[in-house]
Amino acid sequence: MKKNLYIILLSFIAIAVYADNRQGIDFYKAGEPTIASWLFEKQLSSSPAEQAEALYYLGEIAFDENKTFEALANYQKGWTTFPDYAYNKVGEGKVLLKTDKSTAQKAFDAAIKINKKDASVYVAIAKAYSMNGMEAEAQAALDNAKKYNANDPAIYLYEGDLLISKDKPGGAAGRYEQAIHFDPACKEAYIKYANVYQGVTPTLSIEMLQKVISNYPDYLPAYCHLGNIYSLQGNYPKAVAAYKTYMAGGLYSTDNLVHYASALFFNKQYAESGKIISEGQAIDPDNFLLKRLAIYNDYESKAYEKGLEEIETFFNNPDAKYIWQDYLYYGRLLNKAKQYDQAADALQKAIKESSSHTEIYKDLAEVYSNSENNAEAIKAYTQYIEALGEESEAADYYQLGKYYYTAAAKDSIAAQKYLFKADSLFAIVKERVPDSHLGSLWQARTQSQLDPETEQGLAKPYYESCIPILEKNKEKYSNELTECYRYLGYYYYLKQDMDNSKIYWNKILSIDPSNATAQEALKNIK
């Protein structure tokens, strides 16, 4: 926890001193106990009333972490410091219910005695009973809360939480809305409502968070939750914007840094992501998630040597739980280091972890191609396209066609079979993207390999169909046009059609006046 708090201590220079516990309570109730704990500790030198409240919440944080002795000590110290703050007695009773129900009940009675009509205290007691499986007693306490103030939002927060524990999110959301209805300033209810729908109907979560932000623009936890939901949606630009606002408040933990860096990474802001990762690792160098993210970011930033060094250390943790992306990036880094056998092994492990992620097959094909294992490259890329199904694109067939084309050059026995397959794939490219020259051009190249002496002119119609597309941008496609003109010039030369042959050699000179091949051909024709 100290590591997680260090960043907050650094940030304190830039933020105001907090006069009460309100911000700590906001962070605690929004699910940020690390930040809340630091804020409460800063209040332990304030007034007795503020100290008592801070100690109660420090007790709650300890209780949530199953540190019951620490929790009890905080509750009891809080009660001694300021006996008018009832909740410390509720906390004490909550801990004692497990071992001494009679003493626990006395603690609850002492809390109630301070203000017998405080509905929120009864709700806290109900929660204590419920957490210990004493449902009848919990209901009795809740009934008292409703008797004294049926409009207290704490009632509906408690009921919503109970419904969540019973896997009834719809009912829970309704209770949280009631809490907001009775107290529009109940910021915790907005967060809880957003949490209900974030994985189901995130638009409702976003609307609720935007509502609380509109009413309370300084309520920092809402921005963090908003960033989390946008990240879950894959809307990384908005996630980055929300996290940036949250971080500007100066109160954040390493967990928050992980989320922010992740959003930047997935938004392809690798330089910015790297800075946040470095900030987090300066605080917590052993943070596993930051180590993982640093490796991914190294690869995407083209820091391949650094990434490979880091990932080899990363995989030396016997207790770590690795995921398929870890092996994917290991394979990618090994591929860049030209360690192809090890790269293939790493990618096979990635497939074993999650065969449904199609991009692994694509990377595996590249590794096999780089190692000139063309048959395996073809096999892996075919699996990639098959896994994509209807989502496959022209570019996918184009790449597979190129793998077959390359394989033909390396295997004279199977060359014709590979070239026929390449041609069929390039035909798909031409059909899917008729305005592109690539399908026809590569069909021409493939047919040229099937007719290396240009005796049959198999490539002729394909080169001819490329020219109108390429001539729309002669400067960009000068090399491709030269290839087309050269083939056709030579074809007509072989056919003794010198007039047409000269046309194409001159076309080459029109875009490349110093082209030696065209100049020599024209000399021979004359």
Could you say what each language-model-derived stretch is?
Residues N4-I13:
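Sec-dependent N-terminal signal peptides
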Residues K2, Y18-A19, P513:
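Intrinsically disordered, low-complexity peptide-like regions
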Residues M498-P513, L522-N524:
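C-terminal interaction modules of eukaryotic adaptor/scaffold proteins
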Residues A16-L494, T517-K526:
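Alpha-solenoid helical repeat scaffolds
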Residues M1-K2, E177:
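N-terminal hydrophobic targeting signals that begin at the initiator methionine
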